[in-house]
């Protein structure tokens, strides 16, 4: 269970979910119809040495149903394209909130002069930096790690790292919202808005919005023979308290918002999911992707 002020490294609590995401990105990368190319993801999983995830890399069939890694492929592609679109529109600074083991500063082709800020827990960023250094990786942008808890005063830490609120920004909120208490969730959007000059972009995924966590757990147990995250009960890491609806909040604060469901996104990427049970259709319809421009 989560507690106020809890922290983690890459093989515990929320940090372990980042390792899972890296695993699913690595599995997606080797698919013949891969939607992404993330050759860095495998490095992180192998360096961490967590048995469940290294086992999945060695034998993906242990995952059983591959829909979960396919979902991660679509999600990753969505955010890749978001950054490409935003920088193509002239945005020259990007902020990746809860960056985890995200390697976009290394694997995407950023325009010259782009600064990428990665915000996450200190131990997570330290692990990532060590692995990338061990492999001699070179970032394709001006990468600036910002070691801070998103429940704390992260805007101050971001500005201390050189963030300029007077310039348009591309913000990514990927795989994050469910792990925040309601108050921190709402404060996150307030702070993004306050730090965003006109012309800023934001992309958000909102997993299983409005779904009771006990129901989510029951659906997962019913349709997935193996827990994609091994022994960790991901639902226990989520907060299910009241929070603002991101679409309504952003729209009400002057952002122009576009929304799609995970099923719509999968179909757009040539990954339609046929014949899902009604419960999974409902869950997928509640898993949404947003882009917004200020």
From Swiss-Prot:
Leading EC class: transferase
GO molecular function: methyltransferase activity
This protein's UniProt keywords: Methyltransferase, S-adenosyl-L-methionine, Transferase
Residues engaged in binding S-adenosyl-L-methionine: 120, 149-150
InterPro entries in alphabetical order: Ppm1/Ppm2/Tcmp (IPR007213), SAM-dependent_MTases_sf (IPR029063), SAM_mthyl_Trfase_ML2640-like (IPR011610)
Keyword DNA damage: no
EC numbers: 2.1.1.-
Function: Exhibits S-adenosyl-L-methionine-dependent methyltransferase activity.
Family: Belongs to the UPF0677 family.
Protein name per its UniProtKB record: Putative S-adenosyl-L-methionine-dependent methyltransferase RHA1_ro00605
């Amino acid at each position: 269970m989560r507690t106020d002020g809890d922290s983690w490294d890459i093989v515990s609590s929320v940090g372990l979910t980042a390792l899972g995401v890296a695993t699913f990105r690595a599995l997606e990368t080797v698919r013949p119809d891969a939607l992404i190319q993330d050759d860095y993801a495998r490095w992180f999983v192998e360096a961490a040495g967590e048995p469940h995830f290294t086992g999945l890399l060695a034998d993906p069939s242990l995952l059983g149903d591959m829909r979960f890694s396919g979902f991660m492929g679509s999600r990753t592609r969505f955010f890749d394209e978001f950054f490409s679109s935003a920088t193509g529109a002239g945005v020259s600074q990007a902020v990746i909130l809860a960056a985890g083991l995200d390697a976009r500063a290394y694997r995407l082709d950023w325009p010259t002069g782009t600064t990428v800020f990665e915000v996450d827990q200190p131990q997570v960023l330290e692990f990532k930096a060590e692995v990338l250094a061990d492999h001699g990786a070179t970032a394709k942008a001006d990468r600036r790690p910002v070691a801070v808890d998103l429940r704390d005063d992260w805007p101050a830490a971001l500005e201390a790292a050189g963030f300029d609120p007077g310039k348009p920004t591309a913000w990514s909120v990927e795989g994050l919202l469910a792990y925040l208490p309601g108050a921190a969730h709402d404060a996150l959007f307030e702070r993004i808005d306050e730090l965003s000059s006109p012309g800023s972009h934001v992309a958000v995924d909102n997993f299983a919005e409005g779904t009771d966590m006990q129901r989510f757990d029951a659906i997962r147990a019913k349709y997935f023979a193996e827990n994609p995250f091994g022994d960790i009960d991901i639902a226990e890491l989520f907060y299910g308290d009241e929070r603002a609806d991101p679409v309504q909040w952003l729209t009400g604060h002057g952002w122009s918002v576009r929304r799609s469901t995970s099923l719509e996104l999968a179909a757009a990427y040539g990954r339609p999911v046929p014949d899902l049970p009604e419960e999974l259709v409902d869950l997928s319809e509640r898993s949404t992707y947003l882009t917004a421009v200020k």
